[in-house]
Amino acid sequence: MKKFLDLGLQPLANKYLTRKDLRKKRKEQFYHLEVGFDNKTKLVSILNKVPSQKMFDNSYPYRSSMSKTMQKSFKELAKHIKLKMRPKKILEIGSNDGSFLKNFKKSMSIGIEPCANVEKITKKQNFNTIAKYWDTKLAKNILKKHGNFDLIYSANTISHIKDLNDVFKSIDLVLSKNGTFILEDPSLIECLKRNTYDQFYNEHIYVFSYLSLSNILKKFNLEIYKIENLDIHGGSNRYFIKRMDNKIKIEKSVIKQKKEETKYGLNKKNTYFKFTKRVQESKQKLISIFKYCKSKNKKIIGYGATAKSTTILNYCNINDQTIDYFLDTTKDKQNKYTPGTKIKINQYKGGIKEDVDYVFLGAWNFKKEIFKKEKKYIKAGGKFIIHTPYPKII
């Protein structure tokens, strides 16, 4: 694995600080965030991997139900699954608060969610969920109790698991002979095109391309037969995966994706060093925008204290001296402080205040949804600061 990007020391992206933490001057854990490329497998990965138990525990704050965009995406996919695939049993790996599972009968679905605080939400709604990490031991227990599954779904989860061989070995155990595994994760080619280096943080161990994922799947006699390109999370791919002996035809979308990635150079290390140069330029430009705004005594706040924004803030050294506070709709983040940079997170109560001159868009991947919500602020002349595809004020 050849290192191509160094994002410096980074705190755990979802470990938000409390007032008590600040008062007692609790020492945060920082990890050197470096990203590498494996020329043999074409896999892109962070190099210093943090143990899962430190990241996904009883304080995990992310809720997929907080985004209308995510809710809509889950609903549309569920509709397609019901009409075209008609599975009898569904397993979701990384079920979070049940935003996908709620579209199916509880009797036919099982969710895996290791964060007990989030898993409790689905348990209260009588979903069949298991608060454990996905591995072969759990897969064997599920197989023994529930048998095989016609459909396995996982969104923004597989890239969080260190041992990919164990992940796909476990999938192989529980996927039925003619079943489909749908894997949804950020797209590497879109990450490079849009210069979204904040796709890299402690939890995002991998950012997949078709080229890298297909190489891994071969080991387990699995292959991708269809790919959907999504705009979610700043550009994602939805991979439809089957067993190699399943006679479903491989669709044109797979050939198209392979050609696009090869043409862009995702199979060449030089492509990643060029990306690094753009990231460094992006950092300097973003810092200069903030300096300019502060020199004019302008008030800047943040919108969406996301895990992604943790990478940007710490890499660019943007703290509470620059951003007054963040607004966020997630209850478990409110009245806390951003990891590393200690910016206060306030509850979003419906609309940006008139005295705010600039808003740094931490949740840039939901830009359309946010701009629609903040029409009044924009109409009154309010401005946003974004970093992708390059830093600018809009």
PLM segments and residue spans:
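Short, glycine-/aromatic-enriched active-site segment of Class I SAM-dependent methyltransferases
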Residues: L183-Y206, Y210-L213
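A short glycine-rich, Lys/Arg-flanked "PGG" loop and its adjoining helix->strand segment in the class I
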Residues: N165-T180, E374-K379
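A conserved beta-strand element that flanks and buttresses the S-adenosyl-L-methionine
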Residues: Y153
